[in-house]
């Protein structure tokens, strides 16, 4: 997908060489006609990424919460990386990609994604939300390590899932928490070229050992599929269904009809450790699955005051957030200027380099504000996060 998308701009020899065979978007062959007088642009003169920016930012001006949500969505990546994901998931159609991004931002606002991230496990403990915490305490969903493609592995032991003991709201909040947390294990994409050359995604390993129909949760599968397709596009690298018993065949016949072909193509079935070793090193595969990883996940409980930086105001917090937002505004202004340039404009390279520099500053600044906008997780207590 990424290698088929190009942009046409007047580049230096070095930049052309760097972009060769990668991404710098080609012009889309299919773009909708301008709908208003204000859309007096030549669609043959602008690359899809530029068109996406042109279409999206007026919506940010109308709905300030969308801009805020986009900033928080970017996390430790350049904002360009987010735009690239949505464009790639829409086959380079800037109109569709822009609308998909806006829908995602509205979903994040409606779902309260940032509220879930800011409250985290300590809030669940303080409010006696045992449903949320038990899903972590049991080790049902854990970060296992990295696969042979350097993707983080989200390991799900399906036999530990008891849908009858969970409300849909609790399960959906946990799904969002896992999605947002796993993103922090991806390698940061700090420039447009990073987004082109090294798309980052996750390996999801479903361990179906000891699976029974009591563990099946069709509502969860539908919700997860919709999240991957609409709200976290291009996030799934491979989905491994390991040791599926014969009773899973009937289940699979039902759920495969809900999954889009793009996602279905990333699903593989394995039965043995040898099968898994095509994707995961033997040393990472748990001994319970025939591998050499003897480590047993031990959940560490949240501790009092660990999220004080999120809750309390301070001069340091105000200054750090101001810098973070300033870097985003700088990237934003350069990107809006770049999006106005015809692809043949001589200023393309200069302005694009300014975009990348600002995007890199924004991405690098994230870890200075992380403690102010995200509750600590078990992976912070294990000292796994921030060391990707």
Curated annotation (Swiss-Prot):
One of its GO terms (cellular component) is mitochondrion. InterPro entries: CRAL-TRIO_dom (IPR001251), CRAL-TRIO_dom_sf (IPR036865), CRAL/TRIO_N_dom_sf (IPR036273), PITP/CRAL-TRIO (IPR052432). The keyword DNA damage does not apply. This is CRAL-TRIO domain-containing protein C589.09, mitochondrial. It holds the Pfam family CRAL_TRIO. The lineage of its organism: Eukaryota, Fungi, Dikarya, Ascomycota, Taphrinomycotina. CDD domains: SEC14. Residues 1-28 form a transit peptide. It is found in: Mitochondrion. It comes from the Eukaryota. Residues 129-297 form the CRAL-TRIO domain. GO terms for biological process: intermembrane phospholipid transfer; phospholipid transport. One of its GO terms (molecular function) is phosphatidylinositol transfer activity. It comes from Schizosaccharomyces pombe (strain 972 / ATCC 24843). The keyword Transit peptide applies. Keywords: Mitochondrion, Transit peptide.
């Amino acid at each position: 997908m990424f290698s088929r998308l190009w942009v046409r701009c007047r580049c230096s020899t070095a930049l052309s060489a760097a972009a060769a065979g990668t991404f710098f978007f080609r012009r889309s062959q299919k773009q909708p006609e301008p709908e208003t007088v204000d859309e007096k642009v030549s669609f043959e003169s602008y690359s899809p990424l530029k068109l996406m920016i042109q279409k999206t930012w007026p919506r940010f001006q109308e709905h300030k919460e969308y801009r805020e949500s986009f900033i928080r969505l970017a996390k430790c990546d350049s904002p360009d990386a987010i735009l690239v994901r949505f464009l790639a998931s829409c086959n380079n159609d800037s109109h569709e990609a822009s609308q998909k991004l806006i829908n995602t931002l509205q979903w994040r606002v409606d779902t309260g994604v940032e509220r879930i991230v800011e409250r985290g496990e300590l809030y669940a403990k303080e409010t006696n939300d045992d449903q949320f915490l038990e899903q972590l305490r049991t080790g049902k969903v854990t970060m296992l390590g990295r696969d042979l493609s350097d993707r983080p592995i989200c390991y799900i032991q399906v036999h530990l899932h008891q849908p009858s003991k969970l409300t849909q709201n609790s399960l959906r909040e946990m799904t969002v928490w896992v999605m947002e947390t796993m993103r922090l294990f991806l390698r940061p994409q700090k420039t447009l070229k990073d987004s082109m050359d090294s798309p980052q995604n996750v390996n999801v390993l479903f361990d179906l050992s000891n699976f029974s129909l009591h563990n099946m949760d069709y509502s969860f599968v539908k919700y997860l599929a919709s999240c991957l397709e609409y709200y976290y596009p291009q996030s799934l690298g491979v989905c491994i269904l390991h040791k599926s018993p014969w009773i899973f065949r009937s289940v699979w016949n039902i759920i495969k009809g809900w999954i889009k072909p793009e996602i279905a193509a990333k699903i593989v079935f394995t039965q043995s450790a040898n099968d898994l070793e095509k994707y995961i090193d033997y040393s990472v595969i748990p001994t319970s699955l025939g591998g050499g990883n003897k480590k047993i996940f031990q959940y560490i409980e949240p501790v009092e005051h660990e999220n004080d930086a999120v809750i309390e105001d301070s001069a340091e917090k105000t200054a750090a957030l101001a810098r973070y937002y300033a870097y985003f505004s700088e990237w934003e202004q350069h990107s809006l200027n770049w999006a106005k340039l015809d692809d043949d404009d001589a200023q393309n390279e200069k302005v694009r380099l300014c975009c990348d520099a600002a995007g890199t500053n924004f991405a690098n600044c994230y870890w200075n504000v992380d403690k102010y906008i995200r509750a600590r997780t078990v992976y912070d207590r294990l000292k796994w996060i921030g060391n990707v």
